[in-house]
Amino acid sequence: MAMQSETPGNPASTVDPAEIAKFSKLSAEWWDPTGRMAPLHKINPHRVAFIRDAACRKFDRNPKSLNSLAGLRMIDIGCGAGLLCEPFTRLGAQVIGIDPSATNIAAAKVHAEKSRLLIDYRNTTAEAMDPRERFDIVLAMEVIEHVTDVGAFLGRCAAMMKPTGLMVVATLNRNWKSFALAIVGAEYVMRWLPRGTHQWDKFVTPEELTRHLQNSRLAVTEQAGLVYNPLADKWNLSADMDVNYMMVAESAG
């Protein structure tokens, strides 16, 4: 399959070309639950449940329903190969997945076709999206630690929300613990990810993320951490936000 440019041109883009190249190399491994993306596969059910439950509370839906998100428009910014797009499509959402890496989008399209799912995948950036498009749910999961300007990026994400919509952001805290676990542990000891996947100085503290969201006229309504138990080899939602964490934000009115 022929690939187009990896970085859709946009003068205001917050995309970092080096980050795109890094994740493009991993595109063939996205859907291997035992490969380098194994940690994402293990945390994915918890991410899906957290987002689903937040959306159901917001839009008065039954989280136990197989179509709990039916009719809701969702965009997953930096969707990779679609690990979140597919489960939310199965829950009834109308999903658009965007990624600046053409190879990631190609991998996403192939897997969606195999899974017989209709997902609108686009090789583009948040900044290049039609400003008239609005969504009930905007996802920016494990993305902001890879952009060049967090505030500008989140401002663009906020502009894509409907007035009654919500945004969910996931990222990594910046402290000694996240350096030890997310970089030394994940990249050098466990070798879950290639060395250099993350840059510790680009991690974002919950306080910083909250301020960025407030600057975009959003208010944080929910938050949770994701904690790894090495003895059980399992991830769980937790109040501990020292390393991986997620936030839900809505219009501050």
Curated annotation (Swiss-Prot):
Keywords: Methyltransferase, S-adenosyl-L-methionine, Transferase, Ubiquinone biosynthesis. Its EC number is 2.1.1.222, 2.1.1.64. GO terms for molecular function: 2-polyprenyl-6-hydroxyphenol methylase activity; 3-demethylubiquinol 3-O-methyltransferase activity; polyprenyldihydroxybenzoate methyltransferase activity. Disulfide bonds: none annotated. S-adenosyl-L-methionine binds at R47, G78, D99, M141. Coiled coil: none annotated. Pathway: Cofactor biosynthesis; ubiquinone biosynthesis. It catalyses: a 3-demethylubiquinol + S-adenosyl-L-methionine = a ubiquinol + S-adenosyl-L-homocysteine + H(+); a 3-(all-trans-polyprenyl)benzene-1,2-diol + S-adenosyl-L-methionine = a 2-methoxy-6-(all-trans-polyprenyl)phenol + S-adenosyl-L-homocysteine + H(+). InterPro entries: SAM-dependent_MTases_sf, UbiG_MeTrfase. It holds the Pfam family Methyltransf_23. One of its GO terms (biological process) is methylation. Transmembrane segments: none annotated. SUPFAM superfamilies: S-adenosyl-L-methionine-dependent methyltransferases. HAMAP family: UbiG (MF_00472). O-methyltransferase that catalyzes the 2 O-methylation steps in the ubiquinone biosynthetic pathway. Belongs to the methyltransferase superfamily. UbiG/COQ3 family. This is Ubiquinone biosynthesis O-methyltransferase. The lineage of its organism: Bacteria, Pseudomonadati, Pseudomonadota, Alphaproteobacteria, Hyphomicrobiales.
